[in-house]
Regions:
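Conserved alpha/beta-hydrolase "nucleophile elbow" surrounding the catalytic nucleophile
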Residues: 9-11, 72, 76-81, 198
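Conserved loop-alpha-helix segment in the C-terminal half of the alpha/beta-hydrolase fold
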Residues: 23, 192-224, 230
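Flexible "cap/lid" loop of the alpha/beta hydrolase fold
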Residues: 89-127
């Protein structure tokens, strides 16, 4: 029976960002796709629980246990990559593959000053569906996500933008993401870690060696952006399969 592989999306997205790679994983892994608390169809964390990467990971671990899965391989993109790394630290992941993970910067980002882009997005929400049907407009809207936004279908692009606008867990998770950093020191050596960075990722730069867990396998994914599942589904699928095939240390 294939080994379980949990896929975790990034900030403002939902599990559907993995749709392009799912057919390529079929039969190779028992794929589990969950929305993080406060995103997609998932309820936010309880009041008073800060939506840090570690706490989001704890919620996803509990959801996996409810499905009879104790320790899946875990792969995540952006904030989801950081969540996956925290699941590995806690002993809840057989391996971790993090694609352009957040949190590996050297110091907390702090809150971004200036205009609230999501507030503007909410005002423009009625126009999103029509805008994503116009290829040049769709490419402009989605250029943050992908190196080749023209490869993102209109329906998927609309879902990406509306998910970012509507996610009730966005503000809290974004605030926590900008307040904390990932700490690589003391990371369990028995958890294989792969960090893959998109060559054309303009949101998150490649982490310095000192910011990665010891023994991390680091890859540069050519000709893809921050959320590369539409840029090159085959490359992403191979990266996930290879990362989840590395045997854990005994």
């Amino acid at each position: 029976m294939p080994e379980p592989l949990l896929l975790i999306h990034g900030l403002g997205a939902s599990g559907t960002v993995w749709d392009p790679v799912l057919p390529l994983l079929e039969g190779e892994r028992e794929v589990v796709v969950l929305d993080m608390p406060g995103f997609g169809t998932a309820s936010p964390l309880p009041d008073g629980v800060e939506p840090t990467a570690a706490n989001l990971g704890a919620a996803l671990h509990a959801a996996c246990v409810d499905r009879g899965i104790e320790r899946p391989h875990v792969a995540g993109n952006s904030l989801g990559g950081w969540v996956g790394l925290e699941m590995g630290r806690a002993g809840w992941a057989a391996s971790v593959t993090a694609i352009s993970p957040a949190g590996l910067w050297r110091a907390p980002l702090g809150q971004r000053p200036g205009r609230d882009a999501r507030a503007l997005g909410r005002r423009l929400r009625p126009l999103v569906a029509a805008a994503t049907l116009v290829p040049p407009v769709r490419r402009r809207m989605l250029s943050t996500f992908a190196a080749h936004p023209e490869r993102i279908p209109a329906a998927a692009g609309r879902e990406l933008v509306l998910g970012w606008i509507d996610a009730n867990g966005y503000d809290g998770a974004n605030r926590a993401m900008r307040t904390h950093i990932f700490e690589p020191d003391g990371y369990p050596e028995e958890v294989p870690v792969t960090i893959a960075w998109g060559e054309h990722d303009h949101l998150v730069g490649p982490p310095k060696p000192a910011r990665r867990p010891a023994g991390t396998r680091f890859l540069v994914l050519p000709d893809v952006g921050h959320t590369p599942m539409w840029d090159d589904p085959g490359l992403v699928a191979r990266t996930l399969l290879e990362g989840s095939a590395i045997p854990a240390a005994l």
